[in-house]
Regions:
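Transmembrane-helix motifs of polytopic, lipid-linked glycan transferases
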Residues: 1-15
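Hydrophobic, aromatic-rich transmembrane alpha-helices
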Residues: 5, 160-183, 187-194, 219
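Short helix- or helix-capping micro-motifs
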Residues: 22-31, 71, 75
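Membrane-embedded glycan-lipid processing machinery
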Residues: 28, 34-47, 200-212
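Transmembrane-helix signature of polytopic, lipid-linked glycan biosynthesis machinery
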Residues: 32-37, 118, 190-205, 227
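Specific aromatic-rich, kink-prone transmembrane helix
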Residues: 46-66, 215-219
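Membrane-interface alpha helices of multi-pass inner-membrane proteins
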Residues: 53-58, 65-90
Length: 234
């Protein structure tokens, strides 16, 4: 989690946030309920957060060769990292070099090979984990029930999970400022955790949604920055 926080600092600075706002952003991440739980218990979420953070940082800073080298390692922790890898195609700089397409495909194949081998040789205790496809198929007939669960008081509590103020500030940036401060690929990023939240359902909705933190906290900082500028101009 410390490594994730360090990468997050550089990520926020790459988005042109000043040092003060970057520190606030990292503090929000480190003090969130999900992060505290991940630090207190041996959950794989810690590695998951780090991998997602590294992926989007490398894409943001156009370090595509490092991104391709890192791709085979990502799926070892969680197969749900796969959709995040495709965010690179929404980066305009990715298409500037045609070789990037071939490199991306090769890295993707290597990632799948590493994933298959890791699942073959690494035994998981307890009930066998379901794949994304199985979870989606299980979700489809239960969509009304999932939506009712989300709208219930317990569902709302599970979703926010101590991040209510951050999500509220980020929504202001999304609807008022249109997230103009953020590159296009991060605007597509937000849909992945939302889908995972619907698929996961139950008490884990907040955990699945929390992976939105790089964009949610960035948008919250945009709102804070906007309020600071408005206050200083009055």
């Amino acid at each position: 989690l410390i490594l994730t926080a360090l990468v997050f600092v550089h990520f926020l600075q790459a988005l042109k946030f000043n040092g003060f706002l970057s520190i606030i952003g990292v503090a929000i991440f480190l003090t969130s309920r999900i992060t505290v739980l991940a630090a207190a218990t041996p959950l794989i979420d810690s590695i998951y957060f780090l991998n997602v953070m590294v992926v989007i940082f490398l894409i943001l800073t156009n370090r595509f060769n490092l991104f391709f080298l890192f791709m085979p390692l990502t799926l070892i922790s969680k197969e749900t990292l796969l959709p995040f890898l495709f965010l690179v195609v929404f980066k305009e700089e990715f298409w500037a070099n045609k070789k990037n397409i071939a490199k991306f495909i090769a890295a993707l194949v290597c990632a799948f090979v590493v994933f298959i081998l890791s699942r073959k040789f690494i035994q998981v205790d307890g009930e066998k984990a379901k794949g994304i496809g199985q979870l989606i198929l299980a979700l489809l007939p239960n969509i009304p029930e999932v939506l009712r669960a989300i709208m219930s008081p317990q569902g709302i509590f599970n979703i926010f999970n101590g991040m209510f103020l951050t999500y509220l500030l980020s929504l202001y940036a999304y609807f008022v400022n249109k997230m103009d401060h953020l590159p296009r690929f991060l605007k597509f990023y937000v849909f992945i955790p939302l889908v995972f939240m619907l698929i996961g359902g139950g008490v884990h909705m907040g955990r699945h949604l929390f992976i939105i933190f790089p964009v949610a906290i960035s948008c919250a900082l945009i709102t804070i920055e906007h309020f600071f500028k408005a206050a200083s101009s009055t």
